[in-house]
């Protein structure tokens, strides 16, 4: 009997072309991209900058706005905790997130709440979709950030990000999207 892998919401196989490219930089072009003073570092730097341009093109950003981290947890912490620091300076200390966020988002949010930030947890409907009406009702002038995942890592449910963004259109809150499962 052939095994069936049924956890593709959490982890999928790496595209062969991507694996080959990563392997090339791990085995052959293994220089330090922060040390472009020699050939290995220069080639590694060129690889990182190409990856930065490729990611920027996919997400309609400028390459200089793409920051690489070790993974989704570090990225979420950087975004949420960094925003919180800025929020303290401007008096905006309210975060909103959905009830079904990954722990990589929930843990920093809970930490912020324990340190005095206000947090609103949005409910989802019976299909696991965030209720945009509840988001609109939860917004306040001191709302700093709304964090909604793109695709749920357990159910595969896609969130209505266009509607979420539209609800924030006239508000000054940041929209943080954990897109690790949907990129």
Describe every region a protein language model picked out.
Residues 1-183:
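Pyridoxal 5′-phosphate
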